[in-house]
């Protein structure tokens, strides 16, 4: 191990992956984390009977090669998301059942289906041309980034049902309304994770597999390798650099010194730290323009997954909230039955103003609407409001409003002196996902290691 040292701010997947890679490259790393736990936007919880629930990010799927490799390296295992039977689909006034093998495209009348397919085809054709390493250089980048995704939807889809499909997709993927993000960002993001249908699918899609014991076990096992080099309950207040060294100071006055620092906080939170000297305007202005998504993740616990006995997957997709997307999140054994739903975007922000009791009532009403009266009396209710988390302030990740990619894109990962940036939002591949966080952390560690050699 060399005498060089790097301070990593944040013990989520990006920060821990960065520290792990640095140490394999012979450079010492210490990790400073504000929370009393590791995992960042992945978090574990337990039901009353001790069954694990995942309060944050949880899925892995095809082409997320680094995640599967890491799971294997750490001695963990995956199991498939339950996807046997039919999905409940509610678009407009009609509620239908759709066989799970149809993927992410529901059964619709021929006119609507034709409209949806041409929209998906057009979207994919443009998205596939967006350079993942430099989205702002895409063909027609200014035009795409100058309009909201909602504007693109209205211009290129003719039927209300096809438009509703894209709007629900935006909420499910970004936990934001289609009017909150630029069309360029929607296309970059889809291309980053293969394509839009892949982001929405289970089999052969982003929701294909889960991790036995919960995704937070990845962070916990990486953290165990660090030992005393991991410092919890250390909210960072200031990052100071003098041209040769960096000093990271916590709120209670503790100081950690290094040759470089890797900040792995979500961009908006990274912008709230104090920097000495102050950040250049091009970086600070970027952090002011990358809001996190709005989401509350909710669970209803039952004796068993009763929906399975009725031939249902436990998955619902609807354009009527407050829960528009659900999944069967039961453990591999199949018991207890764990129904999971999301309150996202406008629905999430509205629900955040309610009491937990009111949110529970609203959630159960949605589960009953999708899966019938047996959903009315859960044994237990669990929720995590990510907007209320001090060191996240939202999930799943940051989204780019119109104009941000083309005006500030290079600033996302460009170092500022001795300060480097990493995180799920900084990855060209699987941006915003656990895979992206790991890739970004490792890539940034390699860049830093090259500088210090």
Give residue ranges: language-model regions.
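Core beta-strand elements of the Rossmann-like FAD/NAD(P) dinucleotide-binding domain
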Residues: 2-4, 251-260
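Glycine-rich FAD pyrophosphate-binding loop
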Residues: 23-48
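Flavin (primarily FAD) binding-site architecture
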Residues: 263-281
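Conserved beta-strand-loop-beta-strand element in the redox core of flavoprotein oxidoreductases
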Residues: 240-256
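N-terminal Rossmann-like FAD-binding beta1-loop-alpha1 element of flavoenzymes
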Residues: 4-31
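Active-site/ligand-binding neighborhood in enzyme catalytic cores
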Residues: 131-235, 243-245, 264, 274, ...
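Short hydrophobic core segments
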Residues: 9, 32, 236, 255-268
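Conserved flavin/dinucleotide-binding core of flavoenzymes
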Residues: 16-17, 25, 195, 245, ...
């Amino acid at each position: 191990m060399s005498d060089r040292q790097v301070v990593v701010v944040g013990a989520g997947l990006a920060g821990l992956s960065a520290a792990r890679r640095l140490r394999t490259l012979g450079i010492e790393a210490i990790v400073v984390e504000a929370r009393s736990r590791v995992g960042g936007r992945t978090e574990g919880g337990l039901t009353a009977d001790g069954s694990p629930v995942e309060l944050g990010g949880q899925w892995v799927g095809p082409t997320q090669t680094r995640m599967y490799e890491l799971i294997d390296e750490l001695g963990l295992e995956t199991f498939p998301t339950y996807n046997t039977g039919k999905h409940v689909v509610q678009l407009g006034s009609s509620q239908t059942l759709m066989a799970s093998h149809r993927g992410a495209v529901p059964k619709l009348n021929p006119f609507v289906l034709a409209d949806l397919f041409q929209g998906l085809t057009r979207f994919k054709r443009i998205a596939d041309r967006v350079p993942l390493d430099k989205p702002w250089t895409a063909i027609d980048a200014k035009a795409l980034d100058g309009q909201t995704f909602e504007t693109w939807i209205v211009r290129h889809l003719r039927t209300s049902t096809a438009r509703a499909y894209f709007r629900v997709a935006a909420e499910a993927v970004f936990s934001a309304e289609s009017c909150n993000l630029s069309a360029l960002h929607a296309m970059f993001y889809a291309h980053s994770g293969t394509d839009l249908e892949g982001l929405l699918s289970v089999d052969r899609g982003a929701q294909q597999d889960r991790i036995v014991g919960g995704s937070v076990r990845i962070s916990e096992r990486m953290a165990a390798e660090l030992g005393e080099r991991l410092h919890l309950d250390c909210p960072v207040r200031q990052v100071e650099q003098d041209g040769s060294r960096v000093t990271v100071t916590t709120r209670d006055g503790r100081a950690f010194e290094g040759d470089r620092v890797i900040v792995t906080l979500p961009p908006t939170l990274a912008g709230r730290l104090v920097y000495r000297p102050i950040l250049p305007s091009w970086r600070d202005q970027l952090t002011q323009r990358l809001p996190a998504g709005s989401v509350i993740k909710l669970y209803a616990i039952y004796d068993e997954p009763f929906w399975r006995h009725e031939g249902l997957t436990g998955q619902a997709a609807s354009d009527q909230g407050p829960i528009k997307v659900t999944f069967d999140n039961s453990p591999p054994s199949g018991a207890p039955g764990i129904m999971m739903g999301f309150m996202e975007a406008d629905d999430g922000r509205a629900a955040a103003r309610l009491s937990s009791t009111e949110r529970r009532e609203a959630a159960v009403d949605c589960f009953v609407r999708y899966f019938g009266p047996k959903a009315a009396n859960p044994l237990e209710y669990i929720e995590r409001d990510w907007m209320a988390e001090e060191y996240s302030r939202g999930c799943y990740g940051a989204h780019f409003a119109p104009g941000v990619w083309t005006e500030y894109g290079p600033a996302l990962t460009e170092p500022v002196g001795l300060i480097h940036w990493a995180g799920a939002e900084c990855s060209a591949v699987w941006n915003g996902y656990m895979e992206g966080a790991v890739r970004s952390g490792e890539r940034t560690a390699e860049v830093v290691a090259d500088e210090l050699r």
